[in-house]
């Protein structure tokens, strides 16, 4: 969405005759030969290059990110020195376009409720949910089942959302095998400049502010897939997988499906649907 907004801002730039569009993103731009590269912001705790991975190199050539070389505290200090009224405003931590609204309440206004069962990996019913759209893979808080009689006290995590049965599958323990994936299939791949050749080494980030992991990107007959150097938790279809080499953001894609032999075998035994894109 942010990349599309930057593109829209470029249209405004063209219509007004401005030379550049400056935005408040914590990211940087550097020249590399004939290309303009998108770089991580120097303040790693605020870096927003993840959200800009769909911006084109052409648009980057006409963009300015003045905050990219600064820390948040430096920005606040500049604001205080210039008596700006928002100099001490609290950081926003939610989804910017819904304001102070509760996320679930906001979604329910558009999608309503679609109740279903919460089950464990063996199909035992543990409770009920009001809609799969209110949960994400790897989620621990807010599942709504609490302690389960006769079970260990370990935390429950969302491992699978089955659209056909409308079941939310949860497992116990952050180290449960069903939470981990060895890679993922990608859709709607976008390269900011030149694409990487197949089998290239890179780092991939699967959510905002998550630690990037070493990986290899591979081109298949149906698109791209990524193999991680080690299994990682909560790889979520629909989220963005953003590709880096060092500080440079090369582009990214939508996660189409996770790659996990444990998950595939379990899903097949349980009769749940999954896709393999090779």
Q: What does each model-found stretch correspond to?
A:
Residues 22-278:
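AMP-forming adenylation/ATP pyrophosphatase catalytic core
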Residues 19:
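Short acidic/polar active-site loop segments enriched in Thr and Asp
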């Amino acid at each position: 969405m942010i990349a599309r907004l930057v593109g829209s801002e470029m249209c405004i730039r063209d219509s007004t005759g401005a030379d550049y569009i400056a935005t408040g993103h914590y990211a940087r731009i550097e020249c590399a030969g004939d290309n303009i590269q998108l770089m991580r912001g120097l303040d790693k705790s605020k870096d927003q290059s993840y959200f800009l991975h769909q911006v084109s190199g052409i648009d980057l050539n006409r963009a300015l990110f003045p905050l990219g070389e600064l820390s948040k505290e430096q920005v606040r200090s500049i604001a205080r020195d210039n008596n700006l009224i928002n100099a001490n405003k609290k950081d926003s931590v939610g989804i910017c376009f819904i304001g102070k609204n509760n996320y679930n309440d906001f979604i329910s206004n558009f999608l309503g409720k679609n109740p279903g069962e919460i089950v464990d990996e063996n199909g035992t019913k543990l409770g009920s949910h009001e809609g799969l759209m209110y949960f994400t893979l790897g989620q621990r808080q807010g599942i709504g089942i609490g302690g389960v009689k006769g079970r260990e006290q370990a935390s429950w995590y969302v491992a699978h959302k089955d659209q056909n049965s409308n079941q939310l599958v949860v497992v116990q323990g952050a180290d449960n095998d069903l939470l981990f994936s060895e890679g993922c299939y990608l859709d709607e791949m976008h390269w900011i400049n030149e694409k990487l050749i197949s089998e290239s080494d890179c780092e991939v980030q699967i959510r905002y502010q998550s630690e990037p992991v070493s990986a290899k990107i591979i081109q298949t007959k149906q698109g791209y897939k990524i193999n991680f150097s080690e299994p990682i938790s909560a790889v979520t279809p629909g989220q963005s997988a953003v590709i880096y080499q060092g500080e440079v953001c090369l582009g990214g894609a939508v996660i189409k499906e996770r790659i996990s032999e444990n998950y595939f075998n379990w899903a097949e035994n349980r009769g749940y649907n999954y896709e393999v894109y090779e």
